[in-house]
From Swiss-Prot:
E.C. number(s) listed in UniProt: 2.7.8.7
Pfam families referenced in this protein's UniProt entry, alphabetically: ACPS
Protein localization: Cytoplasm
Cofactor(s) this protein cannot do without: Mg(2+)
Protein name: Holo-[acyl-carrier-protein] synthase
GO cellular-component term (any): cytoplasm
Binding site for Mg(2+): 9, 58
Name of the gene: acpS
Family affiliation: Belongs to the P-Pant transferase superfamily. AcpS family.
Length: 130
């Protein structure tokens, strides 16, 4: 397998928390019901966990963009909603794609790592192809 794209994103948790549930913001329709449910089940702030998931979505988009270097970006509408961060029974994150982006990335493996500490959430995404 060869790495074809790497993306990273940082999110200010306080800034994100102010906007996440505000109508009319990009965040209002960004998260799937499963992502919101998982964040609500955590012992700490739901906004902290959603901020890490937002960072993961952005990191995936950046990794995808970097894999298309010198090619026109082809980002479909509502792309963030089509990138879902799910976890296994041990809490390890994985990206599940749907919609148009799933068609563009059907033959790749996406690795993702999320973290949050104090006021910041971060994520890294690596895209590999066979």
């Amino acid at each position: 397998m060869a790495i074809v794209g790497v993306g990273i994103d940082l999110v200010s948790i306080p800034d994100f928390a102010e906007q996440v549930d505000r109508p009319g913001t990009v965040f209002a329709e960004t998260f799937t019901p499963g992502e919101r449910r998982d964040a609500a089940d955590k012992s700490s702030s739901a906004a902290r966990h959603l901020a890490a998931r937002w960072a993961a979505k952005e990191a995936v988009i950046k990794a995808w963009s970097s894999s298309r270097f010198s090619k026109r970006p082809a980002l479909p509408e509502g792309i963030h909603r089509d990138i879902e961060v799910v976890t296994d029974m041990w809490g390890r994150p994985k990206v599940r794609l749907s919609g148009e982006i799933a068609k563009h990335l059907e033959d790749v493996t996406i690795h993702v790592s999320l973290t949050h500490e104090d006021q910041t959430a971060a994520a890294v995404a690596i895209i590999e192809e066979p």
